[in-house]
Regions:
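Asp-based, Mg2+/Mn2+-dependent phosphohydrolase catalytic module
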Residues: 1-16, 44, 49, 135-142, ...
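N-terminal helical cap/lid subdomain that shapes the substrate entry/recognition surface
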Residues: 5-6, 11-132, 144
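Conserved phosphate-coupling serine/threonine residues in phosphotransfer and NTP-handling enzymes
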Residues: 23, 152-154
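Short, flexible loop segments at the rims of nucleotide/cofactor-binding pockets, characterized by
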Residues: 124-129, 153, 183, 226
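Proline-centered loop/turn at the N-terminus of a beta-strand
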Residues: 147-149, 225
Length: 256
């Protein structure tokens, strides 16, 4: 048993589950770069087929916000870009390409090709940035032997790679992506699988995430504490809301 202090309040836990994007790493820094590349590849691909590109018609489908000259500057935390899987995003964009006149098979092929190109550009840039206070908090967890796992809508291989870029992958006993479950967030399967992997009960587990989907998954799985991070104005389903990891702490050794 470990005592976790959140906003000065104490909770007894045996482990922590973390969402990845927007929770461990800065969402906009990583996925903004990916989206910018993806949209540009889509624009070029459609232009080659004689299809006019109206950016707002595409971005509003995913819930991404952009500057007048194009770069992504924000996103809807309730939207598919924030909460959906890569396959969700692919299906939404392919549906739009189909409505633009492409046969479904060609629409899927175009979006998948653009997605692969965007991922390759991300590998070149490595734009991942840790949230403030994360490294300190993970080290404190390690000092207490607290088991940790990641539960993400991203694919497991990609998630592991992003955490490796940050130099934090070794902190997690397991990383569970959307490809390892039959039903992704907000279904509780991912959280329950993570708890089983760590050998802990959901009722003794904290979950940290940045979307309502994370909180819904945690509640459905029966975790004892849901913590919303970086969510101004609160987050539905969160027991506690913090701006960053500086609001999380542990009592000095010997006091827990």
């Amino acid at each position: 048993m470990t005592m976790l202090l959140v906003n000065g309040r104490a909770y007894e836990i045996d482990g922590i589950l973390f969402d990845k994007d927007g929770t461990l790493l800065d969402f906009l820094g990583l996925w903004g770069a990916w989206a910018d590349c993806l949209y540009e590849r889509l624009r070029a691909g459609l232009a080659a087929l004689g299809i006019e590109w109206r950016m707002n018609e595409w971005t509003e489908l995913l819930g991404t916000f952009h500057a007048a000259d194009g770069p992504m500057i924000g996103y809807d935390r309730k939207g598919p870009f924030a909460m959906g899987s890569i396959d969700d995003v692919t299906a939404i964009l392919a549906g739009k390409a189909y409505r633009c006149g492409l046969p479904w098979n060609e629409a899927l092929e175009l979006v998948r090709s653009c997605r692969i190109q965007a991922a390759a550009e991300l590998d070149r840039m490595r734009p991942a940035r840790a949230l403030p206070g994360l490294h300190r908090f993970l080290e404190q967890c390690a000092q207490r032997g607290l088991p940790l796992a990641v539960v993400t809508a991203d694919d497991t291989k990609e998630a592991r790679k992003h955490l490796h870029w940050l130099g934090i992958d070794h902190h997690f006993a397991d990383i569970i992506g959307n490809d390892r479950v039959s039903r992704g967030k907000p279904d509780p399967e991912m959280a329950r699988l993570a708890c089983a992997s760590l050998g802990i009960e959901p009722s003794r587990t904290a979950l940290i995430g940045d979307t309502a989907g994370d909180m819904q998954m945690g509640k459905a799985a029966g975790v004892s504490l849901t913590i919303g991070i970086g969510a101004p104005g609160g987050l539905p389903g969160a027991d506690e809301v913090v701006s960053d990891y500086d609001a999380l702490a542990f009592p000095p050794h010997g006091e827990a």
